[in-house]
């Protein structure tokens, strides 16, 4: 059974359950430990959601809408994902996680979608926990991507899928070496991947919220298969 390191966040349970139901073992990674200790004995890394990343990490001044930045977490997770890739560990990055992944490798972020992207959809759906799996908008998925392969049973019209949404930031300039694997109808980047890595995928929505019903279990199963392969 592959051991998945899951970065600590305020809402851990759905991430934990998603990994368990896909056949993995969970080890929570606290930001207080060393990078070496965090990676010891794990077969894959799952980056979780959370607060905004400090814009200084990608060379920008903070927009007024950027709040609740956690500098220590930013520093730790950026170093962690770089070390994980150096060690060829499979990586699945969710919500804030996709943003950490992009920033760690030289990309930038849209700091506030409502004020910086004209004609944007509503991406920050404020819903109670029991409705966290409600769909918010469609995605357009690149046909030859890892994401498309994993989500083939979920796609409508060959390349679209509905997802939930709870974010006000997004990938802006893509990190070198990565490719876009999904976008929202308004052009917001919703998934990225690194084609040269064994498994390195970031998604902006919250597939973990669907662990009870299994709509996105294939994402976690694909991640765990890569972790097993080592």
Regions found by a protein language model. Name each.
Residues 1-92, 102-110, 114-155, 159-162, ...:
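N-terminal beta1-alpha1 cap of cysteine-dependent amidohydrolase-like domains
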Residues 98:
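The feature captures the ABC ATPase H-loop/switch
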């Amino acid at each position: 059974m592959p051991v998945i390191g899951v970065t600590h966040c305020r809402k851990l349970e759905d991430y934990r359950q998603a990994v368990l139901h896909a056949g993995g073992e969970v080890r929570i990674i606290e930001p207080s430990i060393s990078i070496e200790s965090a990676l010891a004995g794990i077969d894959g890394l799952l980056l979780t959601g959370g607060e905004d990343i400090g814009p200084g990490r990608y060379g920008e001044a903070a927009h007024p809408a950027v709040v609740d930045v956690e500098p220590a977490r930013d520093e730790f997770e950026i170093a962690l994902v770089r070390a994980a890739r150096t060690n060829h560990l499979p990586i699945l990055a969710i919500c804030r996680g996709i943003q950490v992944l992009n920033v760690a490798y030289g990309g930038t972020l849209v700091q506030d979608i409502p004020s910086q992207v004209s004609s944007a959809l509503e991406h920050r759906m404020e819903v109670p926990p029991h409705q966290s799996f409600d769909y918010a908008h469609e995605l357009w998925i690149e046909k030859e991507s890892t994401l498309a392969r994993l989500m083939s049973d979920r796609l409508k019209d060959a390349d679209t899928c509905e997802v939930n949404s709870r974010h006000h930031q997004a990938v802006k300039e893509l990190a070198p070496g990565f490719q876009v694997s999904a976008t929202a109808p308004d052009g917001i980047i919703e998934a990225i991947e690194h084609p040269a890595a064994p498994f390195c995928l970031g998604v902006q929505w919250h597939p973990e919220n669907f662990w009870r019903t299994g709509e996105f279990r294939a994402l976690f199963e694909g991640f765990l298969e890569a972790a097993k392969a080592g």
